[in-house]
């Protein structure tokens, strides 16, 4: 398999970082081909390897891609049914491997690869990492993730000593490897203030039962479908709902309008889930409503609409969800499917809360030390992927740099399209055409800059 240029660059940097610094993290947005990256890296490093995933279906999905990248490698599996360490690379789900009886079977390894590496400091992963290091203290660890910032605030320093590279979403869109998101902030009547005051659980996420109480009303579900039909009636769509009951009611609202919709959740059996995902990928189901099932690792390239029908207190969760719709389409795999962008409809205030889809990153060869944890990270990174330290940088975008459409009031929904790829979610307007009075209206506030007689005044207010 021939790697894309940015993949080749990242793999080369990762190999060099493993040799120089030891345990290494790489950050790439959803859709960058992280499985290809980790497979190519593992193939070049060689030795006895373990590739760790957090879901069973990802184990088989990643093993298949590994064979495509490394056709001569022997691949083994370790799960509930198969326990095979004979291959050059063994794929395992962490929940299976972290049990004491399974940990004792781990052989001496040369390389441990962790997919979705932001999970690496969780207790189940730490048990596997400790067992691997006990067998071979010199075993190298490589992790790849789209979202290094964990919701619980835990840094990754205990596992990784450096970040070899970080790809930006904007750069992959510019190169044509991801499609551009068209993002719409959709406010259902009477929900904005209630969503803004939701209680958070011990994990730091919003209470989804409270979110359900706000969003799961028949009139709201009908409004969601009505707005979806205006923007994405012909698009394959993934909907993220707050609870299973909410998902079922949302799917019913779609079906009431003649749209083939289905629900997948943690309660769906593995057999039924596989069948539903296959039907969705093949086009038999147009809208798939899910509850925390398709957030990570799921890949259906024709998806061109994502509906956030729930709030996200963690930016990483929002990024994973939106990333489901940003992949480009392989014409050989999906003949006749044309995809140029992805419509993102946010009914849960996530875009209002988090403002953008990434930290601003410049791709540079030079590294700098993080003053907080000492990790070596790319110079352009403004937030350390290892510990979360935030570097001081320039402020928000200057007036005139950002565009958005004027709000469109539709029945009981206020819908506003915003350019979420830019640093600021609002547009500056020249009130009198003289450049002396500039006014901007954002999601929740307004700002004005006035100039006269060589002096400048700034005014801010809350909407």
Region annotations inferred by a language model:
Residues 1-27:
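Conserved pre-motif I regulatory segment
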Residues 48-59, 210-257:
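Conserved strand-helix element at the start of the C-terminal RecA-like helicase core
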Residues 60, 75-85, 248-252, 259-295:
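Conserved helicase ATPase core of P-loop NTP-dependent helicases/translocases
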